[in-house]
Swiss-Prot record:
Annotated EC: 2.1.3.15
Disulfide cross-links: none
Keyword Cytoplasm found: yes
Alphabetically ordered keywords of this record: ATP-binding, Cytoplasm, Fatty acid biosynthesis, Fatty acid metabolism, Lipid biosynthesis, Lipid metabolism, Metal-binding, Nucleotide-binding, Transferase, Zinc, Zinc-finger
Pfam family, one: Carboxyl_trans
A single BP term in Gene Ontology: fatty acid biosynthetic process
Organism whose genome encodes this protein: Salmonella arizonae (strain ATCC BAA-731 / CDC346-86 / RSK2980)
Protein name: Acetyl-coenzyme A carboxylase carboxyl transferase subunit beta
Region (Disordered): 284-304
Catalysed reactions, semicolon-separated: N(6)-carboxybiotinyl-L-lysyl-[protein] + acetyl-CoA = N(6)-biotinyl-L-lysyl-[protein] + malonyl-CoA
Cofactor entry: Zn(2+)
Length: 304
């Protein structure tokens, strides 16, 4: 028996450990392998490169509003395939698939609650539901959010993440642009704040309507914001676009948005802004939401 065979005979193979699916994930930006539970505590922000990953509508609203204060609005509204639309797949089949995948009936979730004790109405897009596209139910739920804010005499916050109008609903989808914008005019008449938070991506008919009509338009870092996408624009104008075109950092340089706020700092920032606008006491910055870790941006860690 050769020396290699003698060594091999003394080696006992170890049993391969089985790791449950979904425990680990990878950052789309830097490629870092991340522990899923830690990433959720960091509000889907990569602790290595500060990349803001896409966040579900419900997780976003639950991380924003005070625990125990959330009441969902418009959950009874469901999309209908009135046009019997079909492209490569029937619209009703696309809806059923999206509903099964996300657990949502449509792409916008609306809740009322409190933010640091202040009554607010908040809406958030579920991008995983047909790209967060805006159809008649999205428009109806947004109007319901406006009506609730008017009834409660409180601010409205909307987190947009959408590819634009839903082509399967044709004109009924495009009509939501005017419908939602008209509803916001009532907020302005009443003097109630409407804050629009633009997340990645905010495009098409959503960016061309209520997403850019906030009293303050706030964006998350490196969010893609615009009407047509960069590739479509380059093909149309036949020119190379400047670096960072349509990203939030590019837009704030051009004065198209008001500020960029990191997601872990968003809750306190929104509460502070709304407290000033509503003439209410400033929120306590030393009272972080239970269970939520506020990681510093890379390069800004404390020296402790």
């Amino acid at each position: 028996m050769s020396w290699i065979e003698r060594i091999k005979s003394n080696i006992t193979p170890t049993r391969k450990a089985s790791i449950p699916e979904g425990v680990w994930t990878k950052c789309d930006s830097c490629g870092q392998v991340l522990y899923r539970a830690e990433l959720e505590r960091n509000l889907e922000v990569c602790p290595k490169c500060d990349h803001h990953m896409r966040m579900s509508a419900r997780n976003r609203l639950h991380s924003l509003l005070d625990e125990g204060s959330l009441v969902e609005l418009g959950s009874e509204l469901e999309p209908k395939d009135v046009l019997k639309f079909r492209d490569s797949k029937k619209y009703k089949d696309r809806l059923a698939s999206a509903q099964k995948e996300t657990g949502e009936k449509d792409a916008l979730v609306v809740m009322k609650g409190t933010l640091h004790g202040m009554p607010v109405v908040a809406a958030a897009f579920e991008f995983a539901f047909m790209g967060g596209s805006m159809g008649s139910v999205v428009g109806a739920r947004f109007v319901r959010a406006v009506e609730q804010a008017l009834e409660d005499n409180c601010p409205l916050i909307c987190f947009s993440a959408s590819g634009g109008a839903r082509m399967q609903e044709a004109l009924m989808s495009l009509m939501q642009m005017a419908k939602t914008s008209a509803a916001l005019a009532k907020m302005q008449e009443r003097g109630l704040p409407y804050i629009s938070v633009l997340t990645d991506p905010t495009m098409g008919g959503v960016s061309a309507s209520f997403a850019m009509l906030g009293d303050l338009n706030i964006a998350e870092p490196k969010a893609l914001i615009g009407f047509a996408g960069p590739r479509v624009i380059e093909q149309t104008v036949r020119e190379k676009l400047p670096p960072g075109f349509q990203r939030s950092e590019f837009l704030i340089e051009k004065g198209a948005i008001d500020m960029i706020v990191r997601r872990p700092e968003m809750r306190l920032k929104l509460a502070s802004i709304l407290a000033k606008l509503m003439n209410l006491p400033a929120p306590n910055p030393d009272a972080p939401r239970e269970g939520v870790v506020v990681p510093p941006a890379p390069g800004q860690e404390s020296e402790a």
